[in-house]
Amino acid sequence: MIPLSDTIKNKLNYGLYIVSTPIGNLSDITIRAINILENSDYILCEDTRISKKLLDRYKIKSKLISNHKFNEIKNLNKIIEILKSEKIVSLVSDAGTPAISDPGRIIINECIKNKINIYPIPGPSAVSTAVSISGFSEKYFFY
């Protein structure tokens, strides 16, 4: 792992980082995603128990906040206040990219309304992985 130095952490912009996580193999995570999570003040997790397995693997000790479909509206004001206090907050889902068939849309829309910066951190994609071995021409693939 290539950790960010304190000087690089100071250069990270505060706001909400939408961090893609592995979709099956914990090794399928980008160095950038690890560094962002490692330097987050808070990580919003769809299921903290599942996220903790990934975070423990990479020795990431950021504070976790449960953020799933049953509590995301209830937690919204608290999270927006944290973001307005110029913190680095990451949002992760159990697997893949948050807000793509996972929680995240509500907090993202609220950040847009409040002019809070949002930064997407790309990662693995089940769709492109499946298409890559399908034998289909990309001309006939629509998403």
Identify the role of each PLM range.
Residues R49-S51, T97, A126:
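Alpha-helix capping/helix-boundary segments
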Residues N71-I79:
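Glycine-rich, highly charged phosphate/nucleotide-binding loops
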Residues I107-Y143:
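Class I SAM-dependent methyltransferase SAM-binding "motif I" and its flanking Rossmann-like core
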Residues E46, N67, V92-D94, Y119-I121:
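Structural motif
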Residues I2-F70:
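Glycine-rich, flexible N-terminal cofactor/catalytic loop recognition
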Residues Y14-L16, S85-S90:
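Loop/turn-to-beta-strand initiation segments
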Residues I23-L26, D94-P98:
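Short glycine-rich anion-binding loops that position phosphate/pyrophosphate groups of nucleotides
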Residues N71, A95-P103:
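Acidic, metal-coordinating catalytic cores used for nucleic-acid/nucleotide bond scission
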